[in-house]
Amino acid sequence: MGFGATLAVGLTIFVLSVVTIIICFTCSCCCLYKTCRRPRPVVTTTTSTTVVHAPYPQPPSVPPSYPGPSYQGYHTMPPQPGMPAAPYPMQYPPPYPAQPMGPPAYHETLAGGAAAPYPASQPPYNPAYMDAPKAAL
């Protein structure tokens, strides 16, 4: 037998053994399944524990800082002792400045009395102006 055949046989045996063990651990009739599922005895020691019930310290009552209405199913949670309170701003930030509306509108009367760069009246229609130029012969 060559090296490739020996390797194939060894790999096949390994895979079959792993599959057999997995099936045995999951099958209820196998002895490995029964030994793993059997409850282990609990070793107890004779240690006694004394529990002292002390009243839990209540935080001082703080009036709610939210000015809105309270809801029936909602209860505010008091802050935990030893934890810092959330920093609330003392005042609201200033509002944003209004956006500029663009350049002011143009008025001819405010232009300083300068003459218009074009005539105010429209010249009459001239069809000869639109004709193609004629080639000279």
Swiss-Prot record:
Q: Which UniProt keywords apply?
A: Apoptosis, Endoplasmic reticulum, Membrane, Nucleus, Transmembrane, Transmembrane helix
* Principal subcellular localisation of the protein: endoplasmic reticulum
Transmembrane ranges? 3-23
Protein's cellular compartments:
Endoplasmic reticulum membrane; Nucleus membrane
Listed under GO biological process in this entry are:
apoptotic process
Family statement: Belongs to the shisa family.
Q: Function, please? A: Can induce apoptosis in a caspase-dependent manner and plays a role in p53/TP53-dependent apoptosis.
Q: What is known of its domains?
A: The proline-rich region is required for endoplasmic reticulum localization.
- Describe, as the record does, how this protein assembles with itself and its partners: Interacts with PDCD6; PDCD6 can stabilize SHISA5.
Q: What is this protein called?
A: Protein shisa-5
Q: Which gene encodes it?
A: SHISA5
